[in-house]
Amino acid sequence: MQFIDRSEIEVEGGRGGDGMVAYRREKYVPAGGPAGGDGGHGGAVVLEATANLQTLLDFKYRHRFEADDGTKGGPKNLTGAKGKDLVIAVPCGTVVQDAVTGETIGDLTEPGQRLVVAVGGRGGHGNTHFASNQNRAPDYATEGRLGQQRKLLLELKLLAEVGIIGLPNAGKSTLISVLSAARPRIADYPFTTLVPNLGVVRKVTGDGVVFADIPGLIEGAHQGVGLGHEFLRHIERTRVLVQLIALDSADPLADYRTVIDELGRYGRELLHKSRIVALNKADVCLPEEAEHWRRILSTETGEPVLVISAAARSNLDALLARVWQVLEAPQGVTT
């Protein structure tokens, strides 16, 4: 299941340093020739993939990036210092495109992989460069060139293994936000309301598992009502579905059947996907009422049904344990 997070940025390589006009002044060289050094080249802008980032959220607050300029050439034919490259960390899975031409520049998939996206300008020539038999003491040098400027579109494709589905009132986003708040090593990134909320959960082994809530699943979704078609397609690519049902609903059983009906109408194969059913919002109803609906839903599904409260952080460990159990089972085997 892939979601795309996009950010547009501007990058500019550093300007090259100017060349210098200078002459030899040693007393043993009475007719000193030119000795102006070249300017240093400007630094480049480089993207580097890292496993420590999961989203492009950093680029929401900063859009322009410039590498350092090269320094001016010096006397005695000294070349100016090269500008320092600007290395920008991006998540693995970032596809880089030229925002103007649409050309794909690169795809950063492995940690440590680098891509130069804007080269620095060349340093200018000092007057030594222009000496000739006709002009033994040129009194001019050239300026450094500007660095490359580009507008880039960054697209991040994340693979979500766990899809959280349910009607709009089921508490899907709350569940992800609570899981993230409870575990500092989980990165939570809120997309707009038109795309899923993602939360990266790290197991005790250190492996990251991407959870995504799937908005837009309402009655008529299979016909494209709301955002139905788009998100039902996303659901096809998950390994396991967590179906949340709100206990404060007038009829939790009807809510369950509505979602199942939409899944089946879109594609019968979705009904065979590993699915965990959880009654949410146990904090807003009596325990006996929650147990009543748990029994009904267990009979309906033929599977154990969990009772949780995302808001109260109740029984979430049991939910995650069940998710890990399903994910660790061989693919194609329902646990």
Swiss-Prot record:
Alphabetically ordered keywords of this record: Cytoplasm, GTP-binding, Hydrolase, Magnesium, Metal-binding, Nucleotide-binding
Gene Ontology biological process: ribosome biogenesis
Q: Does the keyword Nucleotide-binding apply?
A: yes
Q: Does the keyword GTP-binding apply?
A: yes
Q: Where does GTP bind?
A: 166-173, 191-195, 213-216, 280-283, 309-311
Subcellular localization, as worded in the UniProt entry? Cytoplasm
Q: What is its EC number?
A: 3.6.5.-
Domain OBG-type G residue range list: 160-328
Which SUPFAM superfamilies does the protein's record reference?
Obg GTP-binding protein N-terminal domain, P-loop containing nucleoside triphosphate hydrolases
What positions does the domain Obg occupy?
1-159
What Gene Ontology terms describe where this protein resides (cellular component)? Answer: cytoplasm
* One of the Pfam families matching this protein, by short name: MMR_HSR1
Quaternary form?
Monomer.
The entry's family comment says: Belongs to the TRAFAC class OBG-HflX-like GTPase superfamily. OBG GTPase family.
What functional role does this protein have?
A: An essential GTPase which binds GTP, GDP and possibly (p)ppGpp with moderate affinity, with high nucleotide exchange rates and a fairly low GTP hydrolysis rate. Plays a role in control of the cell cycle, stress response, ribosome biogenesis and in those bacteria that undergo differentiation, in morphogenesis control.
Kindly give the PANTHER family that the UniProt entry links to this protein: DEVELOPMENTALLY REGULATED GTP-BINDING PROTEIN-RELATED (PTHR11702), MITOCHONDRIAL RIBOSOME-ASSOCIATED GTPASE 2 (PTHR11702:SF31)
Name of the protein: GTPase Obg
Q: What gene name is listed for this protein?
A: obg
